[in-house]
Amino acid sequence: MARQVSGGKRDYPELEKCIKHACKIKVRLRGEHLTEGNCLWCLKTLDYMFEDHKEEPWTKVKFRTIWQKVKNLTPEESNKKDFMSLQATLAGLMCCQMGMRPETLQDAMATVIMKDGLLEQEEKKEDKREKEESVFPIVVQAAGGRSWKAVDSVMFQQLQTVAMQHGLVSEDFERQLAYYATTWTSKDILEVLAMMPGNRAQKELIQGKLNEEAERWRRNNPPPPAGGGLTVDQIMGVGQTNQAAAQANMDQARQICLQWVINALRAVRHMAHRPGNPMLVKQKTNEPYEDFAARLLEAIDAEPVTQPIKDYLKLTLSYTNASADCQKQMDRTLGQRVQQASVEEKMQACRDVGSEGFKMQLLAQALRPGKGKGNGQPQRCYNCGKPGHQARQCRQGIICHNCGKRGHMQKECRGKRDIRGKQQGNGRRGIRVVPSAPPME
């Protein structure tokens, strides 16, 4: 380990004290100490290996940079021992540079590796924080101004997943939206909410609650005569560019818009769990469509929402909450305009559903020839390929052991049999076999 190199500490004046302390480190627990020559050999070797850093003074930054490069090297088998000595000496010098006093080079190596791991974790956290900050639409610039960025696709997909798994008005979606939307513009919040998967009736109710919040704001906050003050259009981001909506003077408007959305989600969620909620009114088994429609309309009329929302719920829920038979009958009768058809038209289309005539009609359609299972093709045998039976019922390939004919089994044979179960008449006889020795000549 002890290697002497010409020159001295004058080549590295910034490391004079560091080398002095490094000479107190033991190479092994019961071995000799590092020498000044060992330290100079290490430094000069590293300068030779990494010439692009040769002119830089040996600071903590340079030590860590060189350590990262040395750590990623893979030495040849013949140079492995010298490489380990180089790495251990570098670790000892790094510890002395940081003010530590390791007893042996093994302690120095362990200390540097542990310190390096902590620094890497901090860098990963910093990168993660920068990545999270980069997905927010409003970015604060160094000069103090603000710029706008589109909502990150990863964040949008996470919100979509939560909405699909837990529901658009669930507490999980509300928490996720409140966390992400703190730096969104009002336009971003409303556009993302509109693109989320969910029940159309729920979205109409949410929009109705937002309209109620806007109307309440107009009543309680009339515009002052001298101008100024927030308007509903500013809060909802109407008529604004994204760049203008991202500025600091619109922070209050964005916060109010987010609070309105959260209030709307909570209100619709409470409606969904309240007894008499029209979205929970579904047609029961064997219930006439007229009775179901009467219950549904009564529940919708009792809702504290505006008349346009009531009309929308009547058109939507009168189809989506109906039974499968009624939905099929409406599709068959009303066609593509089933969603826009009035409740009276749907009642007219479903008046015969459940009657004996309707059941006979369904049975006749099911038994209509030429419409078997699958894609409308008649049922065919996989054995012979002929229609009308299955492979387990196929007679092709079966041979009767009584008469020898194909197409039926012995127990189904109509041929004559004797009293003992044998076929009457002279049966076929094969050639008689007589045992004999083989001819030798």
From Swiss-Prot:
Q: Which GO terms describe its biological process?
A: viral budding via host ESCRT complex
Zn finger regions (CCHC-type) covering which residues? 379-396, 398-415
Annotated SUPFAM superfamilies: Retrovirus capsid dimerization domain-like, Retrovirus capsid protein, N-terminal core domain, Retrovirus zinc finger-like domains
Segments carrying the region annotation (Disordered) are 419-441
**What stretch of residues is annotated with the motif PTAP/PSAP motif?**
435-438
Q: State the InterPro entries in the record.
A: Gag_p24_C, Primate_lentivir_Gag_pol-like, Retrov_capsid_C, Retrov_capsid_N, Znf_CCHC, Znf_CCHC_sf
| Keywords tagged on the record | Capsid protein, Host-virus interaction, Metal-binding, Repeat, Viral budding, Viral budding via the host ESCRT complexes, Viral release from host cell, Virion, Zinc, Zinc-finger
> What cellular component GO annotations does this protein have?
viral capsid
Source organism superkingdom: Viruses
Q: Print the domain comment field.
A: Late-budding domains (L domains) are short sequence motifs essential for viral particle budding. They recruit proteins of the host ESCRT machinery (Endosomal Sorting Complex Required for Transport) or ESCRT-associated proteins. Nucleocapsid protein p14 contains one L domain: a PTAP/PSAP motif, which interacts with the UEV domain of TSG101.
This protein's name: Gag polyprotein
Biological source species: Caprine arthritis encephalitis virus (strain Cork)
